[in-house]
Amino acid sequence: MSTNLKYLSLGILVFQTTSLVLTMRYSRTLKEEGPRYLSSTAVVVAELLKIMACILLVYKDSKCSLRALNRILHDEILNKPMETLKLAIPSGIYTLQNNLLYVALSNLDAATYQVTYQLKILTTALFSVSMLSKKLGVYQWLSLVILMTGVAFVQWPSDSQELDSKELSAGSQFVGLMAVLTACFSSGFAGVYFEKILKETKQSVWIRNIQLGFFGSIFGLMGVYIYDGELVSKNGFFQGYNRLTWIVVILQALGGLVIAAVIKYADNILKGFATSLSIILSTLISYFWLQDFVPTSVFFLGAILVITATFLYGYDPKPTGNPTKA
């Protein structure tokens, strides 16, 4: 049963991530009158929707009893403040990570950023080994290096996207490099820390998601105030929201649920493979649907490497020992 849940959750993650990337890109490029929706508010709304969905799932698990739901939420969240506070750590790190990536993109050319940020694949594996005592074989380590290289090639910017590296000073590039490296390590740690909490405590994945969403909403609202406070006060929190925006928000909320399920029934490393495959899929669909991307030979090379790495990670060489004779 757990194996079926593992592959089902990974398959849904590929579908969800691909759909989210395409709809988000389309929603941000669609030309409409009036102000565009703010991504910072969309993040907060997605967190709130995720909390609501998790409460409904806990309600369903409680045999649709409001009294049982109230007791579970009270016992598992309010009566266990230290357990709830544990989720403030990954939530805060994710917020820090988003800010670090903004700093990195402001101080690095696109190619350096994309290649360096793929180190998060290896940092996730390293934290999985050190924090969860996960054992990886030679083929699995090799597949992770191939995956990292493949994703870097797939996301390699086109000539029109590249910045002139001469315009960036050495000091600026150092700041950008330190920011992206810190983001890589924080991403790996936060993901594995959340996995450790999910797998080593008795609380359900839905309760943990409610706790994570609570802190995510708080940090998200802080982001809205800091980055888009003026725009919100001028045009409102839901400025620019339309049917497509709500689809994006719902897909983001679904992503939080699916990722938690993947981490619970699979692991962060397999999540990285699923996300990498969705990058290829969304890019190819974008080429045929949005027609805003032209695949290059570097992209196809990267796609081949990602697919090869995926199969290599699951390769389990059988020992060919000779039977001993009596």
Curated annotation (Swiss-Prot):
Keywords, comma-separated and alphabetical: Golgi apparatus, Membrane, Sugar transport, Transmembrane, Transmembrane helix, Transport
Tagged with keyword Membrane: yes
GO molecular function: UDP-galactose transmembrane transporter activity
Keyword Transmembrane among UniProt keywords: yes
GO BP annotations listed: transmembrane transport; UDP-N-acetylglucosamine transmembrane transport
Membrane topology: Multi-pass membrane protein
Domain of life where this protein originates: Eukaryota
Bilayer-crossing regions: 8-24, 42-58, 138-154, 174-190, 210-226, 247-263, 269-285, 296-312
Compartments, record wording: Golgi apparatus membrane
InterPro entries: Nuc_sug_transpt (IPR007271)
Single GO cellular component term: Golgi membrane
Pfam families documented for this protein: Nuc_sug_transp
Task performed by this protein: Uridine diphosphate-N-acetylglucosamine (UDP-GlcNAc) transporter in the Golgi apparatus. May supply UDP-GlcNAc as substrate for Golgi-resident glycosyltransferases that generate branching of diantennary oligosaccharides.
PANTHER family for this protein: NUCLEOTIDE-SUGAR TRANSMEMBRANE TRANSPORTER
Subunit text: Interacts with SLC35A2; the interaction is reduced in the presence of SLC35A4. Found in a complex with SLC35A2 and SLC35A4.
Family (UniProt): Belongs to the nucleotide-sugar transporter family. SLC35A subfamily.
The name this protein goes by in its record: UDP-N-acetylglucosamine transporter
Gene from which the chain derives: SLC35A3
